[in-house]
């Protein structure tokens, strides 16, 4: 009880049958998580600047046809069960050993993160996808330190390039 799930997800845009639309992936995940019994906590907007040179999509310089770029992703914070209790002395010691510095706490518990830049990460394999969906080490490092204490188990169900394992 009291475990957290942190999900980094961006919305997507697609043109299907000549119709441009936004797909709100974060809203779909929140809805599914709540159906599974998770409580939704305030999320973080990660201002992840794109590598695209243009700040718009669509018809460019012509009005009523351009769209802003998506330069942010959501970090959804979910909790399963009630608030976590630290009743045993060993649990209390692990919690104290995991304490954050004042500066970290103030920066990390803000609802908008500007200071972590997205990175292009090549997989190196010409037969695979052109790029990975990996996120910067700092993103996993912060979330693990914010929502777990020393000795906790950290799960990354996708594993990918191992960023979460390295941060844990």
Which residues fall in each region the model found?
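Core catalytic lobe of class I
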Residues: 1-168
């Amino acid at each position: 009880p009291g475990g957290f799930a942190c999900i980094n997800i961006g919305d997507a845009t697609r043109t299907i049958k000549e119709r441009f639309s936004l797909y709100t992936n974060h809203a779909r995940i929140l809805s599914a998580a709540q159906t599974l019994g998770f409580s939704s906590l305030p999320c973080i907007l990660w201002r992840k600047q794109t590598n695209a040179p243009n700040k718009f999509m669509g018809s460019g310089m012509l009005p009523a046809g351009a769209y802003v770029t998506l330069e942010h992703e959501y970090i959804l914070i979910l909790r399963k069960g009630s608030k976590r209790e630290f009743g045993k002395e060993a649990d209390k010691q692990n919690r104290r050993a995991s304490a954050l510095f004042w500066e970290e706490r103030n920066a990390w518990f803000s609802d908008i993160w500007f200071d972590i830049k997205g990175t292009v990460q090549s997989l190196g394999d010409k037969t695979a996808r052109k790029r990975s969906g990996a996120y910067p080490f700092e993103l996993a490092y912060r979330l693990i330190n914010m929502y777990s204490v020393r000795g906790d188990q950290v799960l990354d169900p996708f594993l990918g390039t191992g960023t979460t394992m390295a941060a844990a």
